[in-house]
Amino acid sequence: MFFFKGVVAVLSFFSAVNAAPFMKPNNGTRNYIPDSYIVLLKRDISHDDFELHKRWASDVHKRDVAKRGISFSGIGHSWATGSFRGYSGVFSRDTIEEIMKHEHVAHVERDQIGTSQGWVTQSGAPNWGLGRLSNNSPGNTDYTYDENAGGNGVVYVIDSGIDTMHPEFQGRATWGANFIDKNNVDCWNHGTHCAGIIGSATFGVAKLTALIAVKVLDCNGQGPYSAFVAGLHWATKHAQDNGFIGRAIINFSLGGDNSPAVNQALEEAQRAGIFVSAAAGNFGSDAGSITPGGAGLICVIGNSDDRDYRWTGQGPSNFGARVDIFAPGTNILSTIPGGGSGVMTGTSMAAPHVAGQAAILASISGSGFDLGAACAFFKNSASASVKNPGPNTTNKLLVNGANGTKGPKQGENKPNKPPGQDEQPGQNKPPSQNPPPGQNPPPGQNPPPEQPAPSPPANPGDEPNPDGQPYPGDQPNPGDSGPSWWMPSGGLQPPAWWNRRPSFGGWNRPMWWNRPLSVWKL
């Protein structure tokens, strides 16, 4: 997972009376982009007021540039989804002080950038994560999954892009938007790796789901928070405009110092009906003190290893009440650009397992399941298996309900194609289980093993998120053994909680409950 740290600038000139709350500096730890800001407006303003405010801000900017003979670009990205409205841009000190005083402005923060850290790349490790999802104990590499395989799901991978031509994606991956450069390629490998865990034919959880690349990181694994917000807004609006709500998922394997702007963008996507799977972070500290864990509503995922322990080696998984569930994230084999494969470790790899399982859940024919309740559903159907999860942290591990694991068995659907593409023959089944050739790890990504990762600042110093507090995660439940409802005859008997409508959005047992499962040999 990507988490960011850097150098902060002094904000002493931001002391205007009655101005919008400004993000506090973080004791010299942030890497701010000079003269770049993110502006959030109050939720109760109308769309017309938003447009008028942007015109006003542009006029203020133009007057200041003309008067002082300076060169600033002004408003860059803007967004308006539901009641979440704002913009980012490059402004002079005088202009941003004017903007902060405006009655419609709720929050202003400095844009920041950083570099990736806390994940490890190597070659030749076994792909154990899929097998763990469908078996009661670690060590089994057979992956049993329902044959719908996420065929109705649409997953937005907000990351460094996707190698959409990789044969493992079978034409199901497409480019959506690019907020970092003009090159629609994944030159950092991370996004393609995450996408492969979600939906590649050999390494993927949901082997038939559609994948949409939203690029917010450059070839050095860096990206401004304003690009994160713009990418989240684009994915939310794209899902709304194309009728994907109810089957749309966002994978967010990014993060860093706490940002109210990014947190609100994540929450807005979840409010819109998109399931958001977000990495908990790799600092071995409280996940709730940073972004994305500082956001409410979304599902925050920790990293477990192949022995069901919370990962505590290089880039140790974060912990705390804000971690909703654990998933495999250590030494995970998946796709990398150029048709190859490689292994990475981190909560970045854990979150895509949950995103893939959400795509399968979204593909259940006629279920009417609300993806907004998916995180609670996954937690309630999880296995209480994670050892030493950390203080005040759930021990729940993602499972899919096959082979006696506690969890739902899903239904059947057809493979999903990116919007505008016709279904092509021969894409209903995964290819050979052998990994593709060329298992080349990203250059320069082989840090010494078992080295302590840097911890995030103890005091992020951001303004509180005005739209809700992080909610506590599940407490350990040692008695939650799970497989008691698996029938020896090979059929499934649903658990007692199956028809609890208030907890799971009214999702009743569907007709296809006893459909056969497929077994994928790794």
Curated annotation (Swiss-Prot):
GO terms for molecular function: serine-type endopeptidase activity. Keywords: Glycoprotein, Hydrolase, Protease, Secreted, Serine protease, Signal, Virulence, Zymogen. Glycans are attached at N251, N392, N403. One of its GO terms (biological process) is proteolysis. Residues 384-515 are annotated as: Disordered. Belongs to the peptidase S8 family. PROSITE patterns: SUBTILASE, SUBTILASE_ASP, SUBTILASE_HIS, SUBTILASE_SER. Residues 384-397 have a biased composition (Polar residues). This is Subtilisin-like protease 10. Pfam families: Inhibitor_I9, Peptidase_S8.
